[in-house]
Amino acid sequence: MDRLAVVGVGPGPGNYLLPAAREAIAGADILAGGPRHLEPYRESGKELLPLEGSLDTFLDRLGEKRHTGRVALLLSGDPCFFSLLGKLGTRFAPEELEVIPGVSSFQVLFARLGIQWNGTETASLHGRPLEDALKSLREDRGTLFLLDRKNTGPVVAAFLKDRGFPDRVAVL
């Protein structure tokens, strides 16, 4: 049985896709992931397994597909940074996974800003309650929040301002 390739595909277009990720995708018989990650491979002739419905059902199907061919699960950014990898670890042993890191959105952000990220607190508000933002804020360092369509920059800013946090510079 082949290991499940967990492939970080970067923050967006293929120009951030690392060579090791390209190799894993090319060598896979089955590509799994969110619809936007699978879209570029629609005409590839590979079997596509979209993440639809419940996550547990998807992971069950992913486990079954591993017995029928080489599977690559495509995840945004770096799978080692706020991703599905944690949940996969509850289903598969580490030796059953081949994790291929990717470029994360925060790396691209800091590169574009031309600054280092050492010392920056990081937290995800993706699919999480806004109250989680309060756990990560510190006076002595910056905080980077990963956001989603519900917890947008303006929503988070208003939430923090309503709780008495002073105005701060924000990069969105």
Predicted stretch roles:
Residues 90-96, 115-119, 162-168:
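A short alpha->loop->secondary-structure connector
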Residues 86, 90, 111, 158, ...:
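Short, well-ordered alpha-helices that flank and scaffold nucleotide-derived cofactor binding pockets
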Residues 110-139, 148:
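Short, glycine-/small-residue-rich phosphate/pyrophosphate-handling segment
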Residues 61, 136, 159:
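Residues that form generic nucleotide/phosphate-binding pockets
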Residues 8-9, 119-121, 143-144:
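Short, contiguous strand/loop micro-motifs
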Residues 1-103, 107-108, 126-132:
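Class I S-adenosyl-L-methionine
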Residues 2-6, 19-22, 69-71, 139-172:
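A contiguous loop/helix-start segment that scaffolds small-molecule binding in enzyme catalytic cores
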